[in-house]
Amino acid sequence: QAAARQLQLPQPQIVVTQYAGQAREAARQYAASGTPVALYACGGDGTLNELVQGAAGSANVAVGCVPCGSGNDYVRNFGAAGQAPFLDFAAQLQAQPCRVDLLQTSLGIGIDICAAGLDAQVAYGIPKFRRLPGCGGTAAYTLSILQAMLSRFGHKLRVAIDGKENTGTYMMAAICNGGYYGGGYQAAPYAAMDDGLLDIVLVKPISRIQVAGILAKYKAGRHMQDADTIVPEFRSFMTLYRARSVEMQVLDNRPIIATIDGECAPVMELKAEVLPSALNVLLPRPACGSAVIRGLYECPMQAKAK
């Protein structure tokens, strides 16, 4: 409110949500009204996801994010400045909307990453660790990884990428519109949110010792040599595709855990496709990098891909 007064803008309305899904309902109501409005999610990726679901496809609603949750992976997609530009309310109120792609999945709509297998199993276990004192985003994620590594992982899957099928056993899959999940793990360091494509990372089963050995590199995005090349250490078990859609079917009668932007469920089938230019987002200018998103903003993810 102070930033709005300083900029001589109308005072924003502040709504404290009282139940899960309330932000989604509000965004849908604004979208249906046709009135131009900027909606800011003040929370974590779950709160943002509610606004995204409610505003998807609308021309009159723009969605911004003030990161104050435990993971805050969405804002990591926009450069080395990190959260700081998104916590600058003056910059937020002066942001102009630009269009980004979304993920349409059988679990719902999301903006960042849909995952299945070990990494989704990790996300499934995070809430109980977050209840522990001093156990925030990355710490809870790491503890959940350790728990998941002690369980059985790997599923026989039929995978169709843009209609081309293959069958194999996979430990995990990450279907990426953005690059980050799990409190800073960089699954797709060259993913761009406005290129009309998904970066799909498939990982075959490896030993628990191997998982422990590569985890830090995977978190830092060092499994990718460049936009199209996996580093030699990962090539025997990891494959990257860029596509518009992917379908997965479990063939071993054991449900696989899947997640979209942190929301988890056991499934026997998973479908995902890109929704090009499906959402107006608000990016504060200090969050910009060196390649243009729709001619308005700079995105370091695209700069890497050049």
Segments the model singles out, each with a brief description of its role:
Residues T17, G57-I175:
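Catalytic core of DAGKc-family lipid kinases
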Residues A115, D119, A174-P189, C264:
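Glycine-rich phosphate/pyrophosphate-binding beta-alpha loops
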Residues E50-V52, V75-R76, G184-Y185, A212:
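Short glycine-/acidic-enriched loop or helix-start segments at secondary-structure transitions
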Residues I161, T167, A192, L202-K306:
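ATP/nucleoside-binding phosphotransfer catalytic cores, i.e., glycine-rich phosphate-binding loops
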